[in-house]
Amino acid sequence: MTTQPHAEPPDRAHAQATGPADQLQDRHRDHARATPIQQPLLFVGGGNMAGAILRGGLAAGVIDASRVFVVEPDTAKHADLNQLGVRISASATDGVTWINSVDEVAGGQGQRDAANRAQVVLCVKPQMLPQAAADIRAAFASPRVVISILAGTPSSVVRRSLGEHARVVRAMPNLAASISQGVTAICLGDGASRDDDAVAHAIFRAVGPMVMRLEESKFDAFTAMAGSGPAYLFYLAQGMIEGGVRAGLSHEESNRATRQSLLGAAMLLSRSDQAPESLRAAVTSKGGTTAAAVGVLDQREALRAIADAIVAGAARGEELAKLASK
């Protein structure tokens, strides 16, 4: 099942007047009014993204630590998770026992109550899905919503792995969620029905100012563009630092200047209604230093290379999805 595209960024007038730092402050003010999610949450996987989601949700007041259980086989990760005040175990059996016990306390085992029962947040690596699904399948003896952030893994594959009672909401956050500046795509996936994504929307709204509801058919494109987007910027930063050193700066000087330049440019782009090419033209004087630099980028077809990279990433995502579906 799919939904129509829908984005929920700050409103246009507000976006013109404020930048990322201001938006972050506005979201912190909203945190004070946040209503905690009522459904208990079982996180399967306690890696970097799970930690980012938990930290953002806890800071926003959306997630209640006392209603969270994390299954993470790698005990080396437990120390960081313990600081969040959530229950943790290396055993999936413990997680299944916990989620079934909170269901018994809350009551409501029927299909119509699935959206209000404890939900599973699946945060393992895609190649770990078969084992993870086998470990928690007992939690899906009756209808339950599962939020999957597995890259390149269609919701139909997740449901097939967990059983017919799994109601899959697919989500794809990006790395900036770790500093509450992420952009996340979500969709109602296989077996899910209207309102099953309410908890997912609340969670990911807590770790970024934008949550986009997309058709699942667009997830590979979104992953290649926004999910992998931070990597492209880091790649650019790497080149800028190297160029600064070759031009005469020390590595420290070039590193510091690059980081602040990219941050400032991102904030300008966020605050402006102008297209990126218009902003670029505004700082590119004919015959000047920027024109000389951009000329080299144009000669090397840098714009085309970036666009081709995103298309290649999306194509790879489609390939991985086909492999996962076999």
Model region roles, listed by residue range:
Residues T2, H6, R27, R259-K326:
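NAD(P)-dependent Rossmann-like dehydrogenase/reductase catalytic/cofactor-binding core
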Residues T75, L81-L84, S91-I186, D190:
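Rossmann-like NAD(P)(H) cofactor-binding subdomain of soluble oxidoreductases
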Residues T2-A115, Q119, G182, V245-A247:
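NAD(P)+-binding Rossmann beta1-loop-alpha1 motif at the extreme N-terminus of oxidoreductases
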Residues K218-A224, P276-A281:
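Short pre-catalytic strand/loop immediately N-terminal to key active-site residues, enriched for Gly-Thr
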Residues D64-V68, S142-R144, E252:
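Short acidic capping loops at alpha-helix termini that bridge into adjacent secondary structure
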Residues V157-R167, V183-A221, Y232-R271, R316:
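Internal alpha-helical scaffold of NAD(P)-dependent oxidoreductase catalytic cores
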Residues P40, R55, A59, A198, ...:
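Acidic, glycine/proline-rich low-complexity segments that act as flexible tails and inter-domain linkers
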